[in-house]
Regions:
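Alpha-helix capping and helix-loop boundary segments enriched in small/acidic/polar residues
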Residues: 3-6, 55, 74-84, 104-108, ...
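Glycine-rich oxoanion-binding loops at beta->alpha junctions
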Residues: 56, 63-96
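Gly-rich Lys/Arg/Thr-decorated short loops/hinges at beta-loop-alpha junctions or inter-strand turns
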Residues: 43-51, 60-73, 137-140
Length: 194
């Protein structure tokens, strides 16, 4: 496969620069170069955050904006964002009402989000999570907790973001996002490896 890129070591940073320029009316950069935030986050609402590895556009930065996610943490190609990136995403999304971190069921994301939640608590930010596990091809029915999050994440972000935009409290946002995932099934396939 032919690819158009400059230095592969800079591909994520260059992708983010291009994305930010192309969508400067919707998103903006933060002090952490691996966190993108919505340009206008209404005051007094629950923050909604996501994140994941690069190379899955439009996920994750493409779902930051009005009535969706307020911030996204960005990792390297097919690699989880750092705990610090997830924490910084929570910090920029926090409007004093808590933060809903809605993400996919991948080991690196699970580990780093759990660390970020602990760090956020120390910083005075309440973060609750919903883990997407909609991919029926990745684990049997009786092992749903092992399933990956794939296309269902989009519905989780939209439902959670809409509930936050309507003024729902943190528990209501979490419940709405969880209900979306609980009622979503997808089949993820890959034609080539990362």
């Amino acid at each position: 496969m032919q690819r158009i890129m400059n230095n592969p070591d800079n591909i994520v940073d260059e992708m983010l620069k291009g994305f930010l320029k192309a969508h400067s009316d919707i998103v903006e950069s933060t002090e952490n170069g691996r966190v993108v935030k919505a340009k206008d986050i209404p005051e007094g609402k629950v923050g909604v955050v996501t994140g994941g590895g690069s190379g899955h556009k439009p996920a994750f930065v493409g779902y930051v904006g009005k009535n969706m996610c307020d911030a996204a943490a960005v990792g390297e190609i097919c690699s989880s964002p750092t705990a610090a990136a997830f924490l910084d995403a929570c910090k920029v999304a926090d409007q004093g009402k808590g933060v809903a971190c809605l993400y996919g069921n991948y080991s690196g994301d699970n580990m780093n989000v759990k660390m970020a939640v602990k760090m956020a608590k120390k910083a005075g930010i309440t973060v609750k999570t919903v883990v997407a596990n909609d991919d029926v091809a990745s684990a049997p029915k009786d092992q749903r907790e092992k399933r990956r999050g794939v296309a269902g994440e989009v519905l989780m972000w939209k439902v959670g973001g809409a509930k936050a935009a309507k003024g729902g409290d943190l528990d209501e946002v979490i419940a709405a996002a969880q209900k979306a995932i609980d009622n979503t099934r997808s089949v993820g396939i890959g034609l080539t490896p990362c």
